[in-house]
């Protein structure tokens, strides 16, 4: 039985590259994102190279969509919490609160919603590995980035706490901070 990897935000950038790489390494890929056409292109690329890929179109900002899409899954060996957003980078006194909500809902709450559904499956299976894509901005803040940097600092803290929570269940938690 092939190992299964779930990648959020797999429609571009790090998520897409990770899906392609893990498929080459023999993982069955479950690629998620908001843009169905990009997921279809990724699925085509993986399957054309001999891999296996399932796509799920949903927005990690919606707990209901996350649960509906992910609860039916039986086993996940590797989770890559990659979905992320940097929007409306402005000085704090000029920021648009809608952009702030979008970043926090995607970068923090989305990661939590996905992990809340997948972690119990890993616990039941006796192990797994969760990769959270943070950012160096989480520990090295910059001008115009207060909310984005704060959201990635949250990913850093969540990753450390998740590691402590899940270690005894045989689940590794790794934060990657590009």
Can you describe what each PLM-predicted range is?
Residues 27-41:
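Conserved glycine-rich Rossmann-like NAD(P)H-binding loop of the short-chain dehydrogenase/reductase
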Residues 135:
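Residue(s) in the substrate-gating loop at a strand-loop-helix junction
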Residues 57-68, 97:
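The beta1-alpha1 cofactor-binding region of Rossmann-like NAD(H)/NADP(H)-dependent oxidoreductases
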Residues 93, 142-146:
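Active-site loop immediately N-terminal to the catalytic Tyr-X3-Lys motif
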């Amino acid at each position: 039985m092939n190992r299964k990897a779930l990648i959020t935000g797999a429609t571009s950038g790090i998520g897409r590259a990770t899906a392609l790489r893990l498929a080459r390494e023999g993982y069955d890929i479950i690629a998620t994102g908001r843009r169905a056409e990009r997921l279809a292109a990724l699925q085509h690329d993986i399957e054309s190279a001999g891999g296996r890929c399932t796509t799920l179109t949903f927005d990690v900002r919606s707990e209901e969509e996350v649960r509906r899409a992910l609860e039916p899954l039986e086993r996940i060996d590797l989770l890559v919490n990659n979905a992320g957003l940097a929007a409306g980078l402005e000085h704090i006194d000029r920021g648009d609160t809608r952009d702030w909500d979008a970043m926090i809902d995607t970068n923090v709450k989305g990661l939590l919603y996905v992990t809340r559904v997948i972690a119990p499956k890993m616990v039941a299976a006796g192990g797994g590995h969760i990769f959270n894509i943070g950012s160096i901005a989480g520990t090295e803040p910059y001008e115009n980035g207060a909310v984005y940097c704060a959201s990635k600092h949250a990913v850093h803290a969540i990753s450390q706490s998740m590691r402590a929570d899940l270690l005894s269940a045989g689940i590794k938690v790794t934060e990657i901070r590009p």
